[in-house]
């Protein structure tokens, strides 16, 4: 599997350490093992997991700006775990409401020795962080409107929402509230993955402060 991963990384132009490659392979092996009992993903084949879960997560890495990130509706830790593995200098909170998913993430953290991942079992609207995040990641939400509504309290004043989508969602964008600004749209290239992938970056438009009229 390591040789297969090396080939995919080369196609994607992603350079990581040998230790990180080994950890990514371990992640796939654990996901494949746990999936048989806990049904964590509909992708059953480890080779397909490398493409649809690992590479599909890693291509987001170059667009992560800042130090603190939260992956909302992380499922079995996607994209949070692969991103944490190749970004040991960044901190990741992985949020999900299902205990079996959080238990899996805890096991991965233990077996891979990850020190930059914090799993949290909670519904997103009930999770209240003490400090806002530089980036709020999600590939779980069906609609942008839901993501931006339920996660509105999570980014810092300068933080961004980072939504992983398939096709460019023009119709959804037209329905977004006026206080949300699309900062950037990145078309992602995932080797051997059929269909389009986009990463959309949003920010809150901050109200003007300190203006008074007499």
From Swiss-Prot:
Its EC number is 2.1.1.170. S-adenosyl-L-methionine binds at residues 73, 78, 124-125, 139. Disulfide bonds: none annotated. It is an enzyme of class 2 (transferase). It comes from the Bacteria. GO terms for molecular function: rRNA (guanine-N7-)-methyltransferase activity. It catalyses: guanosine(527) in 16S rRNA + S-adenosyl-L-methionine = N(7)-methylguanosine(527) in 16S rRNA + S-adenosyl-L-homocysteine. It is found in: Cytoplasm. The keyword Transferase applies. GO terms for cellular component: cytosol. CDD domains: AdoMet_MTases. Pfam families: GidB. Keywords: Cytoplasm, Methyltransferase, rRNA processing, S-adenosyl-L-methionine, Transferase. The keyword Glycosyltransferase does not apply. Belongs to the methyltransferase superfamily. RNA methyltransferase RsmG family. Specifically methylates the N7 position of guanine in position 527 of 16S rRNA. PANTHER family: S-ADENOSYL-L-METHIONINE-DEPENDENT METHYLTRANSFERASES SUPERFAMILY PROTEIN. This is Ribosomal RNA small subunit methyltransferase G.
């Amino acid at each position: 599997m390591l040789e297969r991963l090396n080939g995919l990384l080369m196609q994607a132009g992603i350079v990581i350490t040998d230790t990180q490659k080994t950890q990514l392979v371990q992640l796939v092996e654990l996901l494949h093992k746990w999936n048989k009992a806990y049904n964590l993903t509909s992708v059953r084949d480890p080779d397909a997991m490398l493409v649809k879960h690992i590479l599909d997560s890693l291509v987001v890495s170059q667009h992560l700006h800042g130090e603190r990130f939260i992956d909302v509706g992380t499922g079995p830790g996607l994209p949070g775990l692969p991103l944490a593995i190749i970004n040991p200098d960044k901190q990741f909170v992985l949020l999900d409401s299902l205990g079996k998913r959080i238990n899996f993430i805890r096991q991965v953290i233990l077996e891979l020795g990850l020190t930059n991942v914090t799993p949290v079992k909670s519904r997103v609207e009930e999770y209240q962080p003490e400090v806002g995040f530089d980036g709020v990641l999600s590939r779980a939400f069906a609609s942008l409107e839901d993501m931006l509504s339920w996660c509105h309290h999570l980014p810092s004043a300068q933080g961004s929402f980072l939504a992983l989508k398939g096709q460019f969602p023009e119709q959804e964008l037209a329905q977004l509230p006026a206080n949300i600004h699309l900062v950037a749209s990145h078309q992602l290239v995932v080797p051997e993955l059929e269909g389009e992938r986009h990463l959309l970056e949003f920010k809150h438009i901050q109200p003007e402060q300190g203006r008074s009229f007499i």
